[in-house]
Every structure is written in C-alpha cells, then in structure tokens.
Amino acid sequence: MKQNSGFEKKLYTTWGRNIDKNNVLTEYPRPLLKRNADSYVNLNGIWKYAFTASNKRPVRFDGDILVPFSPEAHLSGVNRQLKPNEYLWYERIVTFDINMLPREIHLFQNIYPFDINRLSDNSRFIIHFGAVDQICSVYVNGIKVCSHSGGYLPFDTDITDILKSTATKTSFRLTVRVKDFSDTSYHARGKQSLNPKGMFYTAQSGIWQTVWLEYVPEIYIKKIIAKPDFDTKVLRIKVVTNSDNTENNFYYISEAEKKHDNCQINKNDTKISGGKSTIHRNRLTKTNEIKVCINNPDIYIDIPDDKTQADSTHDELYKDSPYAPFTYYGISDTFIEIPLDKLDIKAWTPDTPYLYTFSVNLGKDYVQSYFALRTFTIEKDANDIPRICLNHRPIFQKGVLDQGYWPDGLYTPPCDNALIYDIKTMKSLGFNMLRKHIKIENDRWYYHCDRLGMIVWQDMVNSGSRYKSWFVTYLATFMSLFDISCSDNFNHLFARTSKKGRKEFIKETMQTIDTLSNHPSIAAWVIFNEGWGQFETNKITKLVRKADNSRFIDQASGWFDQGGGDIKSIHNYFFPLRLFKKENRAYALTEYGGYTQIIKHHNTTNKCYGYGDCKNSKELKRRYKKREKEISSLIPHGL
C-alpha cells in the first residue's frame, strides 16, 4: 500500500510510459449497450485547460491537458491540484471532419465539409461523460446544456438542438467547468484527500473517464434492463427508449413458433398466437416494436489482448456468431419474459464464464448486449452453517482489495490492456474475486470481469464530512477485538450531520445499482466501509434489497455492524483470527493482511503505509502463508 503525498516523484506503468496521445482509451466505452463503431466519436485527447478563482470562462487558458486524465495525474501533463476554492475549465473545438463522423451522416450529406444545418431531423447527437469529479457544468458554444453532481457516475445530454441553432458548418466549441471540494465537503470522495497520508491517497479532479459523442436515431434505445433468472431459465428484459410510447401488456412469439403448425393469424383481432405465446399486433407501432435476437452462450476469455492500444477493442464477443438462432418480438419500455429453454443452458462461473450475446432492433436503432445465467445466494450447508453460494453451490471467494489507483493515471488506467492485465494477473495468482474498494470503475472494467470470470464485490463510494479517526479507526479497531458494535444513530460521530449529504448518498447508491446491475460478475453490494459516513444502515439495506434482490448485501464492512444484510463482515489486521457467535448470516473476512514491502524504483514517496513492514519478499510470503493457514482452519466453522 503506497502513501502518496504529492508530486515529488513520478512513477509510470509500462503502458503509461508508451502512451499514444492520439489514441487514448479508444475502445468502445459502453459494452453492455453497444452500437456500431461508426455511430460515435471518441473525444479523448488534447484539450485546453485553465484554473480560475472565478466561475466565469477564462479569456486565456493555461495550456494543454490529456483527457481523460485528471490534472493531478502525471499522464495529464499538468501535475496541478485543483483546490476547493478554484474552478477547473476544459475546452476543445469539436470539428466535423468527414473522417470523424458516423458513416450514416456521410451518406446522408454526401458533402464536405459537413453542414450542421442540414442534419436530418430524425437524428440526435448525445454527448456522454463517463465520470467528472465532483460537480460540473457543460457548455456548447457558450450555452449551458447540463449540470451534474457526483464524481463517480456517468451522465449524458442531448445537444442536437443547440448544435442546429449555434454550430458553424464545420465545428462547435465544447466547454466543461468543474468544481471539486474533495474531502472538505459531504460529497462522495472515496479515498481522496487533499492531505494524503496513511490509508488516504492523492485527490484527483475533473474528467477522469472517456468523453464521447454519439449519433442516434430520433427514437433510440437509452438502456436495457436484463434480469436473467438462473432457476427458471427465463430472461426478463426491458428496453428503455427516449419515447413516451409505452404499453403495459405484452406477449411475445419466437421465429421458431411462427413457423410451427400451431402458430396462426387471427385476422379479426390482428393477433398471432402460438403455443404459450401471443403477440397483439394492434398494440405495435413503428416506434415501440422491438426485435430481440439471442445467441447460444459462449466463453470469451481468449479474446486477443496483445494488439496495439489503438486496435485492441476486445469487442469480438459480438462477432463470433454470424446470426442469432432465436428471435423474439415485443414492445419497448415494459418488461417482457423470454424462456431460454430452447437455447443451450450454460451457467456462468469463474472457471466457465459463459455469456449470452444478443441484439435489439428498434426502428432504425440497433444495439448489442449480453447477459449470463448465474445466481448468488446465502444457503446453509449440511451442518446448518450459512455459506456463500454460486448457482446453489458453496464457493469460497478468495479476493483482493482493488482500490483502482494507478501511479501515473490515479483513477484512470493508462489503457484498456492495463485493466485486463490486472484481472488476469489476479486470476493467475489464485484469486477469484475482487472487491472494488469505494470506487466505481469505467464500464469496460466490469465487462472484462464478466468475460474473464472474475467475481466482484462492489463498494458504494463513501462520503460525509471529515471523519473522526479516533472513533472510526482506533476505537473501532479495539471494539472489533471483542465483537462490539454501536448504533449508527450518532450522526456527529459518523460525520453525517448534513441532511443533504445523507439524501445524496442514498440517491447515488441507487444510481450505482442502476448503472452496474446488468453486469453478471457483480455478486455483492457493500454499502458502508468501516463507519465512514455511516447512517440508517438497515433502512438503506432494505432500499438496496428492493432495488436489486439478485445479489447479497454486505451492509457494514469492517465494523459498526447493525445486524442486517447477508454478511457478517470482519476486518482484522492485528489480532488472531476467530469467529464469534453463530450467525444466520455468512461470515466473511473482508480485509486482512496489509503487509508492505518497499521495492526499489516502485515507490513514489519515501514513506510506506501498511500493517507490518517486510524486509524482503521471502518475509512477505511467510507472513501471508501464516495468515492463510489461520484462514483455512476457520473455513469448516463458517468462514
């Protein structure tokens, strides 16, 4: 665990040292809702930046910044901390180059340069931001198009009308203004600190995930909610559009059933029926009829990842099947149920991460996605001990605490291959789980966990005012020795005196679940960590359960357990390992070890933070082997 206290030393990854500024994180940013490659423009790269004391756009900018790296990151080229009393500005001119624009626009216009005023009324431009920390406003040609608060969540906005009314024939100006209070406010901040030391690290700010411009039809698919049921082998799916045209009742029919002898058309009520399925054609319109094509499952672990950064898209899972054997019709903006019994039934596991790819057509729109059949549950074994189960079989989850910090990019990986390397390396070392620690990654990280077979425990990002270390660290550690907790009603002790801050945390928790819930690799939601900003734990646990009952919940990782959720979550860095009273929940040791070894040329400061310094790798291995032996002895008793 490294302590980073500023910009004294620069430490680069192999990928960061060789980064191509013209091809930065160029992979498709949203694998769970993928349109054709010619439907979007990646806006990563060189932007102008400026720091100001005023909230007014600067007349002059300070220089160039490499987006999406935060100005505090070495790879940004800036190496400057945004302070709470400052504003950070980004700006670039987006040029309508014939080589940049989607092919459909090229064909429609057939002119050069592109004339924004002749853009078809049946098309929309959507600008996407993967994440901007913490609060931002977005401007197109000086006109504000949206604001967003929440430094870890994606957002987008339709800029079509602004472009039509203000853009020139060849370009438009895109400006982003950022305000980041870091750890001086109640907003979500993770482990960021303006005074990094110990377990808290360098604060970063601004744009830190991909920015991209997408071209979509007038009526388009905004999101897909996929809820596969492992036990019933049924896929519940909802295709959410930007249209207000919704229906409550729907039955579907497959292509195979259409051709079957018992499939017939009743002309009187324009109804097609076949077997158990019926589709009411009089309820369908050109704007709400969807076509879902599902492929048989396959494993995509061996997608090549040794290409150059510019070519390494890792999206080949959508190209393996030339056609989908099963097709279903339905209506958008309402849940439909699709039995999967006519497909090959393959369960997702870390060893066999089968994925079902599928496509959805809605009018002129076409997207691709995937799902998996798996279920995570807590079930009792023959000795009446609660166990974490995958597909109703106990699975011992051996994981690492993945904090998602990069020495050269901070929150932002230098490239997609770096994410893959991390996941594959952990698997090669015998780990089958990563606990994503109080950070939300870009969507491609979860996609790689899905296809590579890595289980994820997802933390909610902590927030609240300044924490009281004597309470949430020192006293809590001592109390854990005796399995003592306390009520979370004391908002002043838990840094939760702000009512707005409490509401914001609940809102962002629900948004996190909404954003990530389609990823099959995610097994658990971790609501609070070590009492940081903890409040109303059992109430929030119920809200999380209502939002997603397909995963188990660790409501309080470490200490201040309120007796709810599915996990008795233990942190133990200092004491002999043991289990306490018998639980109806599963026991999990969710943090331990923390041993450190300084490796020459692999540290950014002269200090190292951890829970036991090791002189060499031999001592480090010896300590971990001793700890693992203790852990193994507790597995039969419930760990």
Regions of interest found by a model, annotated:
Residues E218-D244:
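Surface beta-strand/loop "capping" patches
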Residues V140, I294, L362, L390-N391:
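Structural motif
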Residues M433-L639:
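Substrate-binding/catalytic cleft of secreted carbohydrate-active enzymes
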Residues M1-V78, R177, F181-D183, D306:
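Accessory carbohydrate-binding/adhesion or oligomerization-edge regions at the termini
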Residues G142, V211, Y356, H392, ...:
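Conserved, mostly hydrophobic/aromatic
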Residues K2-K9, G16-R17, L33-K34, K48-S54, ...:
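Accessory beta-strand-rich segments of carbohydrate-active enzymes
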Residues L75-F96, S123-H128, Q134-S137, C146, ...:
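Active-site-adjacent substrate/metal-binding segments within catalytic domains
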Residues D244-K258, K286-K380:
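Extended acidic/polar, glycine-enriched regions
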